[in-house]
């Protein structure tokens, strides 16, 4: 029997200050709403996300900001998995990115410290994390995605 390595699917926790839900005015049926939430949760790739966006807009029309935010949070989760980040937690203008200590890469942190200088603080320890200061709260999702892009 050969040993087969099974990739662990990390459940990334996201707690940021944006409205992300499906409004009743957009999808009235609870059953359809649950189906859409499930479909969004099952997205694993950018292709999956594009397909679900097309499907939602075809069935229900242009997405309101709250649904767009829900989709963007799904993108953020995917980016976190690639960057080995297990948790994103926002408190006012600070966003804390907690790394998976099993897959932690100090080279990424050094790169981030050079790029974001006065905007981040690194806290080593049993569970390393970075605190990132958002410049503009109305661009929270955009700034988080830009930060995560640099974590590759």
Predicted segments, located by residue:
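Accessory helical-bundle/CTD segments and flexible terminal tails appended to RecA-like ATPase motors
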Residues: 1-152
